[in-house]
Amino acid sequence: MKIQAIETVAADWSGDYLGIGFFEDSAAIDAGLTQLDQSLQDILQDLVSETEFQGKVGEQPWTRIAGPGSIRKVMLIGLGSPDAFTLDSLRQAAAAFAKAAQKQKAASAGLQLPSWDDDAAASTQAMAEGIELALHQEIRFKSDPDAKKPGEFPQEVHLLGLANQAAAIEKAQQICAGVILTRELVAAPANVVTPSALAETAAQIAEDHGLTLEVLEREECEAQGMGAFLGVSLASELPPKFIHLTYKPSGTPRRKLAIVGKGVTFDSGGLNLKVGGSGIETMKMDMAGSGATLGAAKAIGQLKPDVEVHFIVAAAENMISGHALHPGDILTASNGKTIEINNTDAEGRLTLADALVFAEKQGVDAIVDLATLTGACIVALGNDIAGMWTPEDSLAEELSQASEQAGEKFWRMPLEEKYFEGLKSPIADMKNTGPRPGGSITAALFLKQYIENTPWAHLDVAGPVWTEKENGYLNVGATGFAVRTLVNWVMG
């Protein structure tokens, strides 16, 4: 599929499937249709009347154009109130149009939507993202060869009334390549995406896009004192991999950043085994933080900003065997702090502890970690919103702006220091879990113990990384959540 931005407007375009966006305003709808309708024998006005189209979000009537005209089918796309119009409105509208064009088997499609904030480049990028992500399908594991073929339609999409936007489309496609990589990593089962597979993915990113890669094996992790991370991997027959990808710009970097992703490729719960009804069958996606980290690395490697970025993943399985971590064991992290294990199913924070210590040693200006860390965050915020914890107001503002531009939802949560009382241990520096109330807060407070002076934020993405329901450019399954926010943060 080829996406192009062209100066031609809807009234002059010819092709199989035309989509036109309208705000919720009957006068504007009438005025917008007048010129185009002159060549279509008032078909569009009839469509508006028959379907009672008002321009509301979700309204998408279409009709076939009879006769030998230059357009075969037309779709009207409701955009809602102009006051609520955002870049994500463009993504959603473009996604709906792309899926409709695919369903109608349109070889050529033309889409005309208003620009957001008179910013043609940002608007073009958002539309291209919506199209690319909407048409991505997870079909790798189908046995039918025909099912594995990419969709033939549409073959080309024209973004109408926009000229000289090739760079914006290319940027969208580079970012979407990272999102799609993340989707594929998170969607794949644990017998495919192992710690070694994550390391191999990192190696491919490094080779393709000029990043440097360091992978620490178990012995090297032991030498660095990574007892928390290695404790999680004790029961697995698959070796842990500590992955460190680095992107460096050609010149002096404007700043240095670290992104740390939780990389538990399967979480059985350990000896605190996840039982029926606990969602153990979904625990292949417990590495979604690392998936987003590698997806962001792929995108950043193509975009090549003037920022140095360290992408860090401590990859391991949390399994059961005679060598497994016991409840009551004490682990020592690489900063010397000791941890009493009172729940082996709170393992992600253990891997992140050593990863955060390692990240700070890189001398970066800020660190962001992301993880499917707690079910408590889903209870608090639902499946569509991720939690954000940081003591730094400026970093919180950076991430909020980046997420708003991406159309990904985060909500800043409190780092209530009083709650750390629940993590105190009589025999070690801390326990790895606290009481049930405020579970996502105590998890963030645990991670805070492994940061000394660097500005840091923790993102709990447990809810939004997966969806059971199609929604706009999000198809059922892995969503690729947080990649676009991370990219915007780095580029900002």
From Swiss-Prot:
Its EC number is 3.4.11.1, 3.4.11.10. It catalyses: Release of an N-terminal amino acid, Xaa-|-Yaa-, in which Xaa is preferably Leu, but may be other amino acids including Pro although not Arg or Lys, and Yaa may be Pro. Amino acid amides and methyl esters are also readily hydrolyzed, but rates on arylamides are exceedingly low; Release of an N-terminal amino acid, preferentially leucine, but not glutamic or aspartic acids. Mn(2+) 2 binds at residues 262, 267, 286, 347. It is found in: Cytoplasm. Its cofactor is Mn(2+). Keywords: Aminopeptidase, Cytoplasm, Hydrolase, Manganese, Metal-binding, Protease. GO terms for biological process: proteolysis. GO terms for cellular component: cytoplasm. The active site is at 274, 349. InterPro entries: Leucine_aapep/pepB, Macro_dom-like, Peptidase_M17_C, Peptidase_M17_leu_NH2_pept, Peptidase_M17_N. Mn(2+) 1 binds at residues 267, 345, 347. HAMAP family: Cytosol_peptidase_M17. Belongs to the peptidase M17 family. NCBIfam families: PRK00913.1-2, PRK00913.1-4, PRK00913.2-3, PRK00913.3-5. This is Probable cytosol aminopeptidase.
